[in-house]
């Protein structure tokens, strides 16, 4: 983000007092007004059935409940769920919805952490899960074309079978869809070397909110004719168009990879190690970290071997030609040895590599031993600022007297801040909301951002004024207005709607 688009000050007065109050207001308002204002008539349902076929228009309450929630654990009941099978069907649906002013909420797998796919105004959930074809893998040009409902891991395995590689690897890859990945510009551990989703998307087919079908970009590695709508749509959270086809750049599959787990006596040592590695012209595939509190959670919840003296962990993975990997791993171990290393473990087999990664994969389940509920934020700061950010988070934890544990992608400064609460304990939610705002402010003070991967949705929307200036926000809203004049596509996401709108 350019400097001029950042807010110079951090006004707290412009924000709602609490996210739970905000969520409650959402539910009260929509519970009162959806039926009166947005209930779909029998005629509208018949028109939708004519477009999609009766089996692809879900109206029973049981079916609609299945599409009412995402990973935030919030739930809003849509009036109908649509399962289109083609771009043309989606275009007809959007023309109808735009004509009748019916809100439409695009949905992939519903794996998001910010409420981006929640049908907060009832209306239509348009789910692209049936559009799940890998249309082409072009081995000669290193390009693939897919529909939006293709599951990320399935696609990765398909291209790897022919010796190709799609690097973005969000934690949800076993069930998230590529359409959702594009809408949120998903990241993952391998982003430190290869980049995020938008770095691999070179073309899109999209249905606009008014029902037009447009294509952006294409299967070429270069293209500068007109505005770059592909990049605009990538990360737009389903507010500007519905993705119906994706053109993806691929890479040759690396021959091999090698995994290391390094334990440090301080978070500062781990951060210095990250800088030292990159300064020595080594770019690992992954540089994952866990702080001392996270290590303690894993130690208490599992029988995994983690020394008491370890206050930070780096999981480092390198890939490339097999003959160079041992040399590269040994060079990394040599570089970081003076930085407070407690122990270094280098995998020599795939099984040993999996055992090292098991320590990282056990984190989420281990956190539930601390408290049953969590707010999972994903701030990002310059990587040299990671230790300072961790110290600020520790101070925020002490201030509000609630546990906060941190892990994430050290290579790009993306910290997953997990604020652990018990919703049944009076006052815990209010404490968490105060902590969340303080965490966001601390990240911004260090030159960071409130979200590196998860997006804004409704969860972070109240905090937009902390990061985006009013002038920059108005330009963003102008883009939305131009593409969606009636504000029917995923309304209320990124920028909150007022009840009057």
List where the protein language model places each region.
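Short Gly/Ser/Thr- and charged-rich N-terminal loops/segments
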Residues: 1, 6, 12-27
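Short hydrophobic alpha-helical segments enriched in small aliphatic residues
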Residues: 21, 31-34
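N-terminal flexible segment immediately upstream of the FAD-binding catalytic core
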Residues: 35-95, 111-142, 171, 294-303, ...
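Alpha-helix capping/hinge segments and adjacent helical runs
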Residues: 54, 444-456, 485-489
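C-terminal substrate-recognition/cap domain of FAD-linked oxidoreductases
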Residues: 59-61, 65-67, 251-252, 258-435, ...
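FAD-binding subdomain of flavoenzyme oxidoreductases
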Residues: 133-290
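Activity-critical C-terminal alpha-helical subdomain
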Residues: 212, 461-501
């Amino acid at each position: 983000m350019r400097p001029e688009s950042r807010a110079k000050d951090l006004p707290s007065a412009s924000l709602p007092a609490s996210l739970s109050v905000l969520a409650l207001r959402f539910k009260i308002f929509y519970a009162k007004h959806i039926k009166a204002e947005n209930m779909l008539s029998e005629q509208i349902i018949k028109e939708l059935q004519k477009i999609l076929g009766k089996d692809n228009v879900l109206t029973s309450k049981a079916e609609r409940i299945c599409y009412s929630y995402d990973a935030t654990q919030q739930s809003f009941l849509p009036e109908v769920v649509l399962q289109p099978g083609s771009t043309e069907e989606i275009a007809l649906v959007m023309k109808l919805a735009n004509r009748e002013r019916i809100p439409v909420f695009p949905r992939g797998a519903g794996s998001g952490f910010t409420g981006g796919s929640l049908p907060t105004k009832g209306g239509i959930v348009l789910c692209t899960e049936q559009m799940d074809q890998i249309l082409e893998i072009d081995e000669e040009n290193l390009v693939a074309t897919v529909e939006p409902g293709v599951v990320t891991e399935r696609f990765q395995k398909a291209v790897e079978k022919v010796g190709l590689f799609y690097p973005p690897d969000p934690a949800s890859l076993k069930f998230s869809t590529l359409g959702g990945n594009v809408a949120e510009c998903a990241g993952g551990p391998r982003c430190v070397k290869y980049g995020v989703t938008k770095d691999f998307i070179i073309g899109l087919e999209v249905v606009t909110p008014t029902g037009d079908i447009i294509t952006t970009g294409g299967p070429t590695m270069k293209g500068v004719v007109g505005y770059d709508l592909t990049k605009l749509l990538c990360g737009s959270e389903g507010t500007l168009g519905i993705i119906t086809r994706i053109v993806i750049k691929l890479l040759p599959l690396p021959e091999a990879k090698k995994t290391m787990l390094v334990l440090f006596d301080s978070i500062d040592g781990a951060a210095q190690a990250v800088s030292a590695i990159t300064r020595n012209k080594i770019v690992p595939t992954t540089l994952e970290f866990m702080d001392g509190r996270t290590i303690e959670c894993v130690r208490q919840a599992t029988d995994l071997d983690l020394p008491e003296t370890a206050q930070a962990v780096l999981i480092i993975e390198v890939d490339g030609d097999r003959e160079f990997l041992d040399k590269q791993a040994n060079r990394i171990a040599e570089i970081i040895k003076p930085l407070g290393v407690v122990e270094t473990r280098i995998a020599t087999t795939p099984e040993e590599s999996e055992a090292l990664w098991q320590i990282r994969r056990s984190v989420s389940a281990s956190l539930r031993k601390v408290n049953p509920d969590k707010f999972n934020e994903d701030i990002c700061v310059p990587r040299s600022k990671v230790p300072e950010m961790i110290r600020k988070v520790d101070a925020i934890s002490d201030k509000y007297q609630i546990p906060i544990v941190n892990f994430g992608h050290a290579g790009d400064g993306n910290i997953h801040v997990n604020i652990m609460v018990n919703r049944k304990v009076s006052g815990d939610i209010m404490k968490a909301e105060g902590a969340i705002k303080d965490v966001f402010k601390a990240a911004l003070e260090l030159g960071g951002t409130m979200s590196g991967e998860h997006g804004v949705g409704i969860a972070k929307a109240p905090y937009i004024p902390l990061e985006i200036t009013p002038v920059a926000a108005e330009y963003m809203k102008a883009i939305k207005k131009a593409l969606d004049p009636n504000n029917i596509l995923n309304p209320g996401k990124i920028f909150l709607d007022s009840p009057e709108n």
